[in-house]
Amino acid sequence: MKELINSIGKKKLIMIFGGIVGVVVLIIICLLLYNAFFVSNTYSSVESKIVQAAMEYYGKHQNLLPKSPNDEVSVNSTTLTSSGYLGDLQEMVPDEGVSCAATVTVTNVNNNYRYVANLKCGDKYQTETFVNHVKSVERTVVTGQGLYDMNGELVYRGENPNNYVKFADRLWRIVKFENDSAMLILDDKYARSVWDDRFNTERNRNDGINDYSVSRANDALTNLYNGEDLFSASDKLLIVAHDLAIGKRGETIQYNDGSVEKSQVLEDKYIGLLPLYDYINVSLDENCSSASTQSCSNYNYLNLLESSWWLLTGDSDTTHRVYRIDSSGIIGLTRASTNSYLRPVIYLAKDAIYVGGDGTFENPYLVK
């Protein structure tokens, strides 16, 4: 080897090695430039261009926008192209010879507008909603942690299922899918607050009143949603109004299908707290059946805080007590005027689009 190096010469060897490195670097640069200029249109970027075209279209045709909250309208790619707002889809997508079509749905969200493109390109690509993606990778189970079919809802149960979502720059857990809308709870405590501290005539003191519709907790969460501390304007476009199940419940009641809590609802709220029955259903402990069962803290991914936090549900046997989860994950009743943490609960739009992730803590789901 030494003789070979001497025969070639060290300088020539360095030049040869340098030339090889240079060629490799040149190839890499060429590939990057090719990707930048010729394969820049990923399907996701095409969806973004379709949405931009729809925004320009409705900017010129504002009379066609949905008038009332939750109303929807749609426009297809053929209309956008023929009107001059969008180029030929077949020339925009990364795969040649693929026939594509798209529809943009516009939803009135609290008098703002959410635009969602649904792009289909043969068997090469199909826009995937978040709920459809989860259903395709998370088969429902009947034992162990995971996604369960319960009372017509898809409910995550167990100690640590893959139900993490990164949204509004924070981690959330998917509690369940209800009518294809994901119910999320913040995976941390947010703000310490009384549930309510109004004067209670039965108690003759400020122990609070356990009616969520007129509670301090409702006021605090409504202000939180309306502000910008937790959600940006674009975040709010993905949050949909939902009827909160605020029915009161006794400690020993064992109906966990939501019928008790849903006996009274607070309509069209964008943010709330977790109803008692949802906490009970998350636990896999076979003895967990009511609020009086301490074992509901077992095998329960919602039992993760070292502080107490409020539930949405009031006590049906009193006018001042409310359910909360203590620092050990045990369900208990306490005065509404006590301080505990709020864990906001929201619902994502059923047409929220899956962007990435596998639901683990290290790689949470991403949506748009």
PLM regions: where:
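Structured segments of extracytoplasmic/periplasmic soluble domains
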Residues: 53-60, 83-84, 177, 347
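Structured, soluble extracytoplasmic/luminal domains of envelope-associated proteins
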Residues: 87-126
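Substrate-binding/catalytic groove segments of enzymes
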Residues: 60-65, 84-91, 319-322, 351-355
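Gram-positive cell-envelope targeting signals
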Residues: 1-49, 360
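Conserved hydrophobic/amphipathic alpha-helical signal-anchor segments
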Residues: 34-73
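Extracellular/periplasmic head regions of type IV pilus-like filament subunits
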Residues: 66-103, 221
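Collagenous Gly-X-Y triple-helix signature in extracellular proteins
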Residues: 125-368
